[in-house]
């Protein structure tokens, strides 16, 4: 049976209670290791609940103060990935604490997506089948290692778009592979990946702790930029990425003006982040910090 570790960052007791009620049947079905990263104190602590046996819980309190961990943001999920690695899972998944399954099984949908092989450069214009013209020789070129899930109900939009479309619900998504050389907007509220991607899935430094390094304080790009870095790594390693195969219900709309303040600092950098990341001569202070912390993350993972 596939060993699955599910990482969930949380700061809200009420959200956690609803989350567990909605997800526990699937956690029991798939016998997952649940890794809860609680980040509402001065420093996060991590609790593991193994649904493969009885409800065995172990608490790490507080989490070790590794220099790559930035708390007080959803990038604290890095702590969960680190702890999960010690259990040697076959698949890592992560969900936000305000998402729920619909009448589906998102865990199985991710597992199915990670069994796929896909073209390196081609995409299908049809759902679940290749149309006439896609060469047979390219249809299973590369192994999928990252499944980016999507959401029903409340969409994950940036603040300016939220202001333009305040009542938007249930936007449409495509099931597709993301070809080599193409980037996409990665949202960490619902995704799964294989172990070989763990060194590159590190969620980018965010939150007020950036000020300790002389970098302007911003937020809400930790998962976006992690997605850029992970996709570039997949391209380099000839590994595949798919999106749209696993769907959850996103239940909570975030506060638009709070989001606007958090996003404003990094909006300009987001326009050029991929280029700055790939530029060996970059002088951007944030990108240099990110690269330093990513190297620290990879070094600590290698010790496990």
PLM ranges: what are they?
Residues 1-28:
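N-proximal low-complexity "stem/linker" segments adjacent to membrane-targeting elements
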Residues 5, 15, 159-162, 168-304:
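C-terminal catalytic/acceptor-binding lobe
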Residues 13, 35-42:
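Short, polar loop motifs at secondary-structure junctions
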Residues 40-88, 104-108:
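Active-site-proximal specificity loops/subdomain of glycosyltransferases
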Residues 42-43, 100-104, 250-253:
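Short catalytic/ligand-binding loop motif for oxyanion handling, primarily in non-cytosolic enzymes
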Residues 55-64, 101-209, 283:
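Conserved catalytic core of nucleotide-sugar-dependent glycosyltransferases
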Residues 92:
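Short aromatic/hydrophobic "clamp" motif used to bind/position activated sugar donors
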Residues 95-97:
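Active-site acidic Asp-centered loop
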């Amino acid at each position: 049976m596939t060993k699955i570790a599910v990482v969930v960052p949380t700061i809200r007791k009420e959200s956690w209670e609803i989350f567990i009620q909605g997800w526990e049947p699937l956690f029991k079905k798939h016998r997952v290791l649940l890794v809860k990263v609680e980040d509402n104190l001065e420093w996060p602590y991590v609790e593991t609940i193994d649904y493969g046996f009885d409800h065995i819980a172990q608490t790490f309190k507080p989490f070790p103060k590794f220099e790559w961990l930035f708390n007080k943001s959803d990038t604290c999920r890095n702590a969960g990935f680190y702890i999960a690695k010690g259990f040697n899972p076959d698949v890592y998944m992560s969900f936000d604490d305000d998402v729920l399954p619909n009448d589906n099984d998102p865990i199985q949908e991710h597992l199915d997506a990670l069994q796929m092989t896909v073209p390196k450069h081609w995409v299908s214009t049809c759902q679940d089948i290749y149309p006439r013209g896609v060469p047979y020789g390219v249809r299973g070129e590369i192994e999928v290692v990252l499944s980016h899930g999507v959401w029903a109900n409340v969409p994950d939009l940036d603040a300016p778009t939220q202001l333009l479309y305040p009542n938007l619900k249930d936007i449409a998504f495509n099931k597709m592979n993301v070809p080599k050389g193409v980037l996409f907007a990665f949202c960490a509220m619902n995704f799964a990946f294989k172990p070989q991607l763990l060194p590159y899935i590190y969620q980018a430094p965010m939150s007020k702790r950036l000020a300790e390094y002389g970098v302007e304080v911003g937020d809400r790009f930790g998962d976006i930029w992690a997605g850029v870095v992970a996709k570039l790594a997949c391209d380099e390693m000839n590994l595949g990425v798919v999106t749209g195969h696993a769907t959850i219900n996103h239940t909570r709309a975030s506060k638009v003006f709070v989001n606007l303040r958090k996003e404003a600092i990094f909006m300009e950098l987001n326009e050029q982040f991929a280029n700055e990341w790939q530029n060996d001569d970059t002088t951007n202070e944030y990108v240099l910090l990110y690269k330093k912390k990513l190297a620290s993350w990879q070094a600590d993972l290698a010790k496990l």
